[in-house]
């Protein structure tokens, strides 16, 4: 099982930081971009670089890849997701993989680790929400209203879980500790250990009369709306943390956080790689042969570009500062214009005669379809 191949594709060490991974990705992506590199195999290399970055730029996928290889990164050993079409989910706890001595002793003793005060304040769960952005919204930034359900303190009992006029009492079985002592027979003999109290479920409190609204949980699901200011230059997969916008805490603990994950739609005109933008510019072969000044679309509006005589298909020109804003830094990236020369179809008689005259002047014999033609001279 090779769990270093993705790092090798980007040319980074397995302990590389996210900034190092991103920098390496942009370098390799530009090196093998099919519009800039016409060598055989470049497009396949480009796809491999994209695949590696998609995994290594996501901390959860990267951790799975480091442990299990490509199968782990692709969800072969379980996984999460965005929780369905709503684009919303909570962050669950737990862990996978293979245990060691801790698992063995846990099976004997019913658990392990330090005791936790059941009455101590605990922060609420973090939540995740996916926002879909149009290409231009990601470039220039936008404000979005995000509406989702989260757990808040019950408006009836104020979070106590008890019916109005009553209060939670100290658990009669565990005395408020949340745990009880039990004696078990193990292969090592009879041993005493601590387990979660089966009466209060570890809370240390006992609710005799439960709140009719929350049924004793102290929380209720509430529709919540928050304004998200999306910064200019975000990309697919990047996250924004909104502190205190997650689920309500326990025992007076703070609210969890909301993590907004961005998903950017593709453009029908441009391709984007970080702060750099690529545009394929169709051009008449006469313009390419003679040279011309053309008007090129950019995300910032149309600009003039001088094309020298003799320009070939695949030639690229840089428009400095006409790319996307740099999310971490100042200024914009660049736009690359890739020339695509268009061969005319359905020529009229005057056009045919003009080309035939040019062919004759160039010493090229044009004798019909399937034989050596005008453009063969330039191959």
UniProtKB/Swiss-Prot annotation:
<keyword id="KW-0863">Zinc-finger</keyword>
<feature type="repeat" description="CXXCXGXG motif">
    <location>
        <begin position="171"/>
        <end position="178"/>
    </location>
</feature>
<dbReference type="GO" id="GO:0008270">
    <property type="term" value="F:zinc ion binding"/>
</dbReference>
<dbReference type="GO" id="GO:0005737">
    <property type="term" value="C:cytoplasm"/>
</dbReference>
<keyword id="KW-0677">Repeat</keyword>
<feature type="binding site">
    <location>
        <position position="200"/>
    </location>
    <ligand>
        <name>Zn(2+) 2</name>
    </ligand>
</feature>
<dbReference type="InterPro" id="IPR036410">
    <property type="entry name" value="HSP_DnaJ_Cys-rich_dom_sf"/>
</dbReference>
<feature type="binding site">
    <location>
        <position position="174"/>
    </location>
    <ligand>
        <name>Zn(2+) 2</name>
    </ligand>
</feature>
<dbReference type="GO" id="GO:0042026">
    <property type="term" value="P:protein refolding"/>
</dbReference>
<feature type="zinc finger region" description="CR-type">
    <location>
        <begin position="141"/>
        <end position="223"/>
    </location>
</feature>
<dbReference type="InterPro" id="IPR002939">
    <property type="entry name" value="DnaJ_C"/>
</dbReference>
<feature type="repeat" description="CXXCXGXG motif">
    <location>
        <begin position="197"/>
        <end position="204"/>
    </location>
</feature>
<dbReference type="GO" id="GO:0051082">
    <property type="term" value="F:unfolded protein binding"/>
</dbReference>
<dbReference type="GO" id="GO:0051085">
    <property type="term" value="P:chaperone cofactor-dependent protein refolding"/>
</dbReference>
<keyword id="KW-0346">Stress response</keyword>
<dbReference type="InterPro" id="IPR036869">
    <property type="entry name" value="J_dom_sf"/>
</dbReference>
<protein>
    <recommendedName>
        <fullName>Chaperone protein DnaJ</fullName>
    </recommendedName>
</protein>
<dbReference type="GO" id="GO:0006260">
    <property type="term" value="P:DNA replication"/>
</dbReference>
<keyword id="KW-0143">Chaperone</keyword>
<feature type="binding site">
    <location>
        <position position="171"/>
    </location>
    <ligand>
        <name>Zn(2+) 2</name>
    </ligand>
</feature>
<comment type="similarity">
    <text>Belongs to the DnaJ family.</text>
</comment>
<dbReference type="GO" id="GO:0005524">
    <property type="term" value="F:ATP binding"/>
</dbReference>
<dbReference type="InterPro" id="IPR018253">
    <property type="entry name" value="DnaJ_domain_CS"/>
</dbReference>
<dbReference type="GO" id="GO:0031072">
    <property type="term" value="F:heat shock protein binding"/>
</dbReference>
<dbReference type="Pfam" id="PF00226">
    <property type="entry name" value="DnaJ"/>
</dbReference>
<dbReference type="InterPro" id="IPR008971">
    <property type="entry name" value="HSP40/DnaJ_pept-bd"/>
</dbReference>
<keyword id="KW-0862">Zinc</keyword>
<feature type="domain" description="J">
    <location>
        <begin position="5"/>
        <end position="69"/>
    </location>
</feature>
<comment type="subunit">
    <text>Homodimer.</text>
</comment>
<comment type="function">
    <text>Participates actively in the response to hyperosmotic and heat shock by preventing the aggregation of stress-denatured proteins and by disaggregating proteins, also in an autonomous, DnaK-independent fashion. Unfolded proteins bind initially to DnaJ; upon interaction with the DnaJ-bound protein, DnaK hydrolyzes its bound ATP, resulting in the formation of a stable complex. GrpE releases ADP from DnaK; ATP binding to DnaK triggers the release of the substrate protein, thus completing the reaction cycle.</text>
</comment>
<feature type="repeat" description="CXXCXGXG motif">
    <location>
        <begin position="154"/>
        <end position="161"/>
    </location>
</feature>
<feature type="binding site">
    <location>
        <position position="211"/>
    </location>
    <ligand>
        <name>Zn(2+) 1</name>
    </ligand>
</feature>
<keyword id="KW-0963">Cytoplasm</keyword>
<dbReference type="GO" id="GO:0009408">
    <property type="term" value="P:response to heat"/>
</dbReference>
<dbReference type="Pfam" id="PF01556">
    <property type="entry name" value="DnaJ_C"/>
</dbReference>
<feature type="binding site">
    <location>
        <position position="197"/>
    </location>
    <ligand>
        <name>Zn(2+) 2</name>
    </ligand>
</feature>
<keyword id="KW-0235">DNA replication</keyword>
<dbReference type="InterPro" id="IPR012724">
    <property type="entry name" value="DnaJ"/>
</dbReference>
<dbReference type="Pfam" id="PF00684">
    <property type="entry name" value="DnaJ_CXXCXGXG"/>
</dbReference>
<feature type="repeat" description="CXXCXGXG motif">
    <location>
        <begin position="211"/>
        <end position="218"/>
    </location>
</feature>
<dbReference type="InterPro" id="IPR001305">
    <property type="entry name" value="HSP_DnaJ_Cys-rich_dom"/>
</dbReference>
<dbReference type="InterPro" id="IPR001623">
    <property type="entry name" value="DnaJ_domain"/>
</dbReference>
